[in-house]
Amino acid sequence: MIDEKLKGYIDKRLNEIKDKIPDKLHEDLRAAIMDINGVELTEEDIDRIIDLTIREYQQSLIEPGEAIGVVTAQSVGEPGTQMTLRTFHFAGIRELNVTLGLPRLIEIVDARKVPSTPMMTIYLTDEYKTDKDKALDIARRIEYTRVENVVSSVSVDISNMSITLQFDQEMLKDKGVSIEEIKKIITKLKLGEIRIEDNDEYSFTIYFEKIDSIMALFKMREKILNTKIKGVKGIKRAIVQKKGDEYVIITDGSNLEGIMNVTGVDINKIQTNNIHEVEEVLGIEAARELISREIKKVLEEQGLDVDMRHIVLVSDIMTRTGDIRQIGRHGVTGEKSSVLARAAFEVTVKHLLDAAARGEREEFKGVIENIIIGQPIRLGTGIVELTMKPNMR
């Protein structure tokens, strides 16, 4: 237990070092010291803890002139060679696939508009998260369901100009849809003059009074089958899973804006792997954070440990202009100010011709262009400029 006298000493020492460490580390250090229980601390112990923290923090900083770009490229690229090239099933869910390993890492740094396996993890509000039935109800509401998802067979009668729909009883129950609900939706469609007659409990026939061509009848068939019954566009499948003490919904497909409007969803905890969607809905800072998390997640799933600072550098470079740009000739590399650096990467002749036509000037400020012409690069000891005063005697 820390007494009031020691608390005063802790605050005094922490105020003395406020300029030596970041604010967040300062807050965390104070909280960590105050949380120490079961040990009687002295002022000397407090001094040792604070001095050790400052020393460790200062040792974690890079040296001036460090080639952080090359170190990051090696630190992320080398583990990338150890990655698998497969798509895995999502843990415990047979129906959902998730791209992992090198293919997912390539997707992220290429800034692909849509991931190959878009997914969301949806957390629920307190009222819904502990009740499985309520969670299932939300899952049914967000899963995008069309008429074709619940029919077992469709038959077209060209003599009577009618379409008969036979519905799958199990699918209706699974999706939480009723026949009456489907009838109401079909009658609201612009199908012209129609008449609906029941055949049995799970089947009805739609008669078209004013259609006289087979092509028009088949167009109506497609229109009916593609009609939305309910759900959020882009969500192909929604599955409820137990996670600790609460139920969460895992989806195949992603629609962040649509899901945020669903009652019962905790909008502060929604997760998606679609980076461009996050940028459109929440902004570039949120997208930057997601890039870092997704890269870290991919590496950790493969059992690879990479310093977070390397990963953050990649996400910073990809988002520094306010838009998400890929690491490649159509993004970061292709937009370098140096003509020689652009030419050294890809399509050399095109870059040189374009630069000559525009009258661009090479400043030789970067690494690649200086290596090309054989002069020292401005990194490490090369960043230091010294002038020696000769002995005039």
Curated annotation (Swiss-Prot):
Reactions catalysed according to its record: RNA(n) + a ribonucleoside 5'-triphosphate = RNA(n+1) + diphosphate
UniProt keyword annotations, A-Z: Cytoplasm, DNA-binding, DNA-directed RNA polymerase, Nucleotidyltransferase, Transcription, Transferase
Family annotation (SUPFAM superfamilies): beta and beta-prime subunits of DNA dependent RNA-polymerase
Molecular-function GO terms, alphabetical: DNA binding; DNA-directed RNA polymerase activity
Pfam families in alphabetical order: RNA_pol_Rpb1_5
One biological process term in Gene Ontology: DNA-templated transcription
Enzyme class: transferase
One GO CC annotation: DNA-directed RNA polymerase complex
HAMAP family, alphabetized: RNApol_arch_Rpo1C
Family of this protein: Belongs to the RNA polymerase beta' chain family.
Alphabetical list of NCBIfam families matching this protein: RNA_pol_rpoA2 (TIGR02389)
Assembly behavior: Part of the 13-subunit RNA polymerase complex. Interacts with TFS4.
Protein name in UniProt: DNA-directed RNA polymerase subunit Rpo1C
Species the sequence originates in: Sulfolobus acidocaldarius (strain ATCC 33909 / DSM 639 / JCM 8929 / NBRC 15157 / NCIMB 11770)
Organism placement in taxonomy: Archaea, Thermoproteota, Thermoprotei, Sulfolobales, Sulfolobaceae
